[in-house]
Curated annotation (Swiss-Prot):
Catalyzes the decarboxylation of S-adenosylmethionine to S-adenosylmethioninamine (dcAdoMet), the propylamine donor required for the synthesis of the polyamines spermine and spermidine from the diamine putrescine. Is synthesized initially as an inactive proenzyme. Formation of the active enzyme involves a self-maturation process in which the active site pyruvoyl group is generated from an internal serine residue via an autocatalytic post-translational modification. Two non-identical subunits are generated from the proenzyme in this reaction, and the pyruvate is formed at the N-terminus of the alpha chain, which is derived from the carboxyl end of the proenzyme. Heterotetramer of two alpha and two beta chains arranged as a dimer of alpha/beta heterodimers. It comes from the Archaea. The modification Pyruvic acid (Ser) is found at residue 64. Belongs to the prokaryotic AdoMetDC family. Type 1 subfamily. Binds 1 pyruvoyl group covalently per subunit. HAMAP family: AdoMetDC_1. Transmembrane segments: none annotated. This is S-adenosylmethionine decarboxylase proenzyme. It holds the Pfam family AdoMet_dc. Disulfide bonds: none annotated. Its cofactor is pyruvate.
Length: 130
């Protein structure tokens, strides 16, 4: 039997209100709340403000990461949510972001990561991990 180690959501959100995505000050609380809504464990986060507008950010999660880039002039947010463990956590975080940003359209892919790993193949000898 094969198992996947995580789920990866890659999304383009179109038609987002520029006021919500023009500054890191505006969008960072949305992303921080998405982490909480997704029951994810934040290790750290970093946000960057572009001039005159636009923002990027990344949150390092115990489960993996959440990142985004905004283009307010196009009403566009590109989003990346990758989590290991409970797959519904990524969905909850994604759903929250969609609910708050209210894009007019969304193009997304949801991939299982590491899906070719066989369940019965594991390194059990600690010396092999060095």
């Amino acid at each position: 039997m094969k198992v996947a180690v995580g789920v990866h959501i890659i999304a383009d959100l179109y038609g987002v209100d520029a006021r919500l995505i023009s500054s890191s000050e505006a969008i960072s609380p949305i992303m921080e709340n998405a982490i909480q809504e997704g029951h994810l464990t934040k290790i750290s986060s970093e946000y960057y403000q572009f001039r005159p507008m636009g923002a990027s950010g990344i949150a390092l999660l115990a489960e993996s990461h959440l990142s985004f880039h905004t283009w307010p002039e196009y009403g566009l947010v590109t989003l990346d949510i990758y989590t290991c463990g409970d797959r519904s956590n990524a969905d909850r975080a994604f759903d929250y972001i969609i609910k708050v940003l209210k894009p007019t359209s969304v193009d997304y892919r949801k991939m299982e990561r590491g899906s070719q790993i066989k369940e019965d193949v594991r390194i059990t000898d600690p010396q092999m991990m060095l």
